[in-house]
C-alpha cells in the first residue's frame, strides 16, 4: 500500500465516520494528530531522500550494466534485472510522498491513484523477485546444472510476477483519492464492510511478505545445508552471503508487516481504543515502512555487487570511463605559453 504514513489525519470518533482504512466507531472524542504530521514533515523527507539517492545510484548501475555490458544472462540475472527495475520504479514515487508529507498532495486525484498503484506494484513485485532468486539459487546448488540458459519458463515467471503485482495494486487505483486536507489517502465507501478492508490488508501481507519469506527461508535453508555437505568446497563465504540476505530481509520487512497485521486486526476488532494508541500506530507505520523501503538500496549490494562476475563488469565500466576521462583531458590540455616549446603542462578544466 502506498505510503500509509501519509494517512495521519485528525479523525472524529463518532458512529459512521470513515477515514482512510480506519473505522474507529467506538471512539467518542476527537483525536488531533498535529504532532504526528509534524513528525512526518521532518522524518519522511529526510529518510526518503536518502533512500532515493542511494537506491537510484545502485539500481541504475545494475540496469545499465545488465542492459549494455552483460549479454550472456542466466535466470538469476533476469530476476535481478527485473528486481532492479521494480526498485527504480518504486524509488521514483518517493519524491511525491516526501512532498505529500510536507505540503500535501498537489498533483491531483489521478496522479494520486497512479502513484499509489505504482508504489504497491513495485513494492510487491520486488519481494516476489527476491523469492524467484532464492528458488533459482536453490536449483543451481541442489540440482544438475542446466545448459539451456534463460528459457521461456523464466519469462513466464516474470510475467506472472508482474501480473500478480498489478492485480494487487488495483485497490490503490480504485480507493486512493485526495481528501479535504489535500492528502493522498485511501477512502473506502461505507457499503464496503470492515472485513473487505481487512482482507485487502491481509492479501498485501501474504503476497508481499509471507509467501516470499517462506520461499526464501526454505530455499536458502536447503541451499545452506547442501553447501555444508559438499566436500572440498570453501563454503564460508556463500553461507555468509545467504545468512546476510535472510537477516537483512527479516530486519527490514518483518517490523513493517507486523504493524500492518496489527492494523488489519484492528480494522475488524477495533483494538485501538485511545488517541495516544492511534498516534503510536501512525508513527510506527511511518518508521517501519521507511525501513522496509531501505531494502531497495541494499538489493544491488546483496544480490549483485557481492558476485565476482558483476564486479568484473563494474571494473570494465570504471576502466572505460577512466580511459574516456583521460582522452578528454588530453584534448583539453594546452600550454599556458602557446608559443613556447611543447612540454607537459597543467590542465585547465571548469
Curated annotation (Swiss-Prot):
Residues exposed to the Cytoplasmic side: 64-87, 135-154, 223-240, 311-350
Keyword DNA damage set for record: no
Ranges of the Extracellular topological domain: 1-42, 109-113, 176-201, 262-289
Domain of life: Eukaryota
UniProt keywords, alphabetically: Cell membrane, Disulfide bond, Endosome, G-protein coupled receptor, Glycoprotein, Membrane, Phosphoprotein, Receptor, Transducer, Transmembrane, Transmembrane helix
Transmembrane segments: 43-63, 88-108, 114-134, 155-175, 202-222, 241-261, 290-310
Short name of one Pfam family: 7tm_1
Biological processes per GO annotation: calcium-mediated signaling; cell chemotaxis; chemotaxis; G protein-coupled receptor signaling pathway; immune response; positive regulation of cytosolic calcium ion concentration
Cystines in this chain: 112-184
Tissues/organs with expression: Predominantly expressed in heart. Lower expression in lung, pancreas, spleen, colon, skeletal muscle and small intestine.
Gene3D superfamilies: Rhodopsin 7-helix transmembrane proteins (1.20.1070.10)
Protein topology in the membrane: Multi-pass membrane protein
GO molecular function, one term: C-C chemokine receptor activity
GO cellular component terms, semicolon-separated: early endosome; external side of plasma membrane; plasma membrane; recycling endosome
Cell location: Early endosome; Recycling endosome; Cell membrane
List of glycosylated residues: 6, 19
Post-translational modification: The Ser/Thr residues in the C-terminal cytoplasmic tail may be phosphorylated.
Its biological purpose: Atypical chemokine receptor that controls chemokine levels and localization via high-affinity chemokine binding that is uncoupled from classic ligand-driven signal transduction cascades, resulting instead in chemokine sequestration, degradation, or transcytosis. Also known as interceptor (internalizing receptor) or chemokine-scavenging receptor or chemokine decoy receptor. Acts as a receptor for chemokines CCL2, CCL8, CCL13, CCL19, CCL21 and CCL25.
Subunit-level organization: Forms heteromers with CXCR3. Interacts with ARRB1 and ARRB2.
Family affiliation: Belongs to the G-protein coupled receptor 1 family. Atypical chemokine receptor subfamily.
Protein name: Atypical chemokine receptor 4
